[in-house]
Amino acid sequence: MTVKNETIDYSKTLYLPQTNFPMRGRLPQKELELIARWDNMGLYAQLRQQAKDRPLYILHDGPPYANGHIHIGHALNKVLKDVIIRSFQMRGFNANYVPGWDCHGLPIEWKIEEKYRAQGKNKDDVPLNEFRQECREFAKYWITVQSEEFKRLGVVGDFNSPYTTMAFHAEARIASELMKFAMSGQIYRGSKPVMWSVVERTALAEAEIEYHDYESEVIWVKFPVLQADSSDLCGAYVVIWTTTPWTIPGNRAVSYSSQISYGVYEVASTQNDFGPQVGERLLFADALAMSCAEKAKLVLKRLRIISADELKTLFLFHPLKGFAGSYNDKIAMLDGAHVTENAGTGFVHTAPSHGREDFEIWNAYKPLLEQFGIDSSIPFPVDDAGFYTKDAPGFGPNREGGAVRVIDDNGKMGDANKEVINALIKADRLFARGRLKHSYPHSWRSKKPVIFRNTPQWFISMDKDLGDGSTLRSRALEAVSMTRFVPSSGQSRLASMIADRPDWVLSRQRAWGVPICIFANEDGVILKDERVNERILRAFEAEGADAWFAEGARERFLGERAHESWVQVLDILDVWFDSGASHSFVLEDRDDLKWPADVYFEGSDQHRGWFQSSLLESCGTRACSPYKAVITHGFTLDENGKKMSKSLGNTVVPQEIIKTSGADIFRLWVMTTDYWEDQRLGKQILQTNMDLYRKLRNAIRWMLGILAHDEGEKISYCALPDLEKFILHQLFELDQLINRAYDEFDFKKIMRALLDFSITELSAFYFDIRKDSLYCDAPSSKKRKASLQVIREIFERMVIWLAPMLPFTMEEAWLEHSPKSHSVHLEQFRSVPGEWQNGFLAERWRKVRQVRKVVTGALEFERAAKRIGSSLEAAPIVFISNPVLLEALENLDMAEICITSALTITQDVPPSDAFILSDVEGVGVYPGKALGTKCARSWRYTQDVGSDPAYPDVSARDAAALRELQMLGKI
């Protein structure tokens, strides 16, 4: 039967892609629809049910603070965690993600206090537990807000039952962990210089400190020699340098280093009528003497060397000796390893009330100091409001006009520096003065400078013998050595921080937090009574930590011991202890989790924060780490590599990206970064990722469209054409790379590999070659069916591989492909048949593609010269003198592979004008024009067009396809 070919619309006889999967994602709208779908179907519950018998994989969530909307760092962190959770869930694990929130602490207190100030209320007039309840409600509100923001990012987890540090059970467990430290003797009340925020009226941990440039007043001070073995030192001065003049009233010693060369110098001349005068003898480190002379505008003459042995015998007067009738103690010289000759004078003013190293060297020399008749107690020269106390005579409350202030409530320096310097000038003890811009500690909340001040606080000892020969420090260092770190540099970073850190300051003088729920006597001895502890824990479990502050709490908890002289401690715990104890009340106490966690994953700043507090808390109570691995990410900078800041106007708000572009665009950006380093983000970078997304989406869309014609016929591997086997080999290698990279948390490697595969290997190579067969071959074509089978494998594996990274787009694509499926996220990564691995074919096709590259280059040259339009207009002659390449082309249809209508291969010598590429030796191409007639259906030029009289304008292949389609009733 013949058909009049003029009645046929050939475009309707082709197997062209057909899909409802749109080219434009409309992600902001589509993602909301998918979130609603997941909620309605109970996706999280289905994931848990499906995986209940699999081995657990636990990523323990480092809790963000329940205050304000999420920022770009939160979004980055949660997306990375989500990819880990999803990838392990889809690779045979039960990866349950339980989000958490840190709820206690000063920032929330500040918010409530701000509200009070706006209402004209005084916080001190509000009952403590009423204030705490307002803090609790504030945190609860922001947990709800942040939960929705995290879910909008595509994060899947147990948002209906998250953990919070303010839950009654959590507060009870935090208290229980504290009691373990107390009962084992690791907690003590001490007097130590701590970083103190006058603005916030509390001690700060190292993790609560950030460093900013700050301009300080600096002074060089002369300490007169009181006692020396050499007569030439009587009347001489030891000169120190300090950036904190206000600490001079707290001076108790001068430190030097036995590793530094020192000398005795004489003032030879001076430009000043005040300060050091000609003939004065001064002691300096030799390396620093001349720079000090320049500061004082004088000339020094070196008289002699002074040895460390001689220095240690010296005793000095305090530079304020006699001021306000005080400062009459003698000042010892102490040999300290912390002294350097990098700056200053080589002598260090030592005030054990105002510095960690000063405190440590003072305590190390305590027995010797007492032998010298020096009072070794450490004074409290500054109070919590930044005023001098009675321990700073002449500057404290007995001073006419009242106590001088070091720093005020706004974080501004008071008059202390000025008053101390004036006193030194009057005593003729000022050598020189100046100003210095340097890095100085500030509170991370108030952004105001802090001071070191000696305060009574509660501490966890880092170096107490724990009964087995170990200390908390040694246990933690051992645990670090056994932990996996990504990147590996994190291990040495955390280890060095632990090795150098001081004892852990537990106490805070605030209101919103878990109390240090212990009783102690006036000497700081802690009550160790299990019955008292049990009463406290039962109350916390039922009522929360507010029970500690309720009226009658002391009598309630002490019970029959209430008549004894135990004092209830009212300080609250460092919030890092709260989150550091989360492994106990989350990992240990939930049936759906396990202890220890497989991984903790946070920003690199958490080496001094949550990673460290969790490690110390666990090592102190369990002698080992609560995690097996630690992964860190860097910080997000703007497009120019600058820190994001509201004042600079360069912040990127994740909610805006989601609103305008979609969460998957943000997630794609995360997946293309080296997240363990600092990343950059801005409009141009987002645009680049949107372009990548479009290419990826178009490849998926094309596969969906062509698979609309897939009838699911299965062809054995042996029967597949070589090209399909080669593509399956690439899938095999991709599978190996992707699984390995997911294990290594190298998401950029996965995304880059899949983007390259999609754009270079599929769209620009395999799909391009097979489009003619897929569109034009007959329904019964084995080649077409083989290609459809391989594309099905590609599509399903790619979508599953990408699902953890781009959960919205891959869900949309999967549901288009398998409408009856519940969700791609319920799928598992599929095993790859070993027979797909074929190194021989891979090498063969590497050679084939070298030849193809030369042919393609020649055709591009012809197209640019407008000698051809489509590559189908060409019938190139390929000259191959390389026998290895020639052998690789045997039995291959190179015209199809190069997408030309014909192609001739010859071993003849190529003409001089043949097209060549320098990196492919032995191949030349002469781009001849295709002979024959253009097929109206496939657009190929062949000499058999019209060979079937029923279809005079199509090739024999296309005519046969049309006959088969007609026979099947498809046209």
Curated annotation (Swiss-Prot):
Binding site for ATP: K646
Binding site for L-isoleucyl-5'-AMP: E602
Compartments where located: Cytoplasm
A GO MF term: isoleucine-tRNA ligase activity
Span of the annotated motif 'HIGH' region: 64-74
Biological-process GO terms, alphabetical: isoleucyl-tRNA aminoacylation
Keywords from the UniProt entry: Aminoacyl-tRNA synthetase, ATP-binding, Cytoplasm, Ligase, Nucleotide-binding, Protein biosynthesis
Catalytic activity reported: tRNA(Ile) + L-isoleucine + ATP = L-isoleucyl-tRNA(Ile) + AMP + diphosphate
UniProt cross-references to InterPro entries, sorted A to Z: aa-tRNA-synth_I_CS, aa-tRNA-synth_Ia, Anticodon_Ile_BEm, Ile-tRNA-ligase, Ile-tRNA-ligase_type1, Ile-tRNA_ligase, M/V/L/I-tRNA-synth_anticd-bd, Rossmann-like_a/b/a_fold
Major location (coarse): cytoplasm
Matches recorded under SUPFAM superfamilies: Anticodon-binding domain of a subclass of class I aminoacyl-tRNA synthetases, Nucleotidylyl transferase, ValRS/IleRS/LeuRS editing domain
EC number of this enzyme: 6.1.1.5
Motif ('KMSKS' region): 643-647
HAMAP family: Ile_tRNA_synth_type1
Record text about domains: IleRS has two distinct active sites: one for aminoacylation and one for editing. The misactivated valine is translocated from the active site to the editing site, which sterically excludes the correctly activated isoleucine. The single editing site contains two valyl binding pockets, one specific for each substrate (Val-AMP or Val-tRNA(Ile)).
Function (record text): Catalyzes the attachment of isoleucine to tRNA(Ile). As IleRS can inadvertently accommodate and process structurally similar amino acids such as valine, to avoid such errors it has two additional distinct tRNA(Ile)-dependent editing activities. One activity is designated as 'pretransfer' editing and involves the hydrolysis of activated Val-AMP. The other activity is designated 'posttransfer' editing and involves deacylation of mischarged Val-tRNA(Ile).
UniProt name for this protein: Isoleucine--tRNA ligase
Species of the source: Bartonella quintana (strain Toulouse)
Lineage: Bacteria, Pseudomonadati, Pseudomonadota, Alphaproteobacteria, Hyphomicrobiales
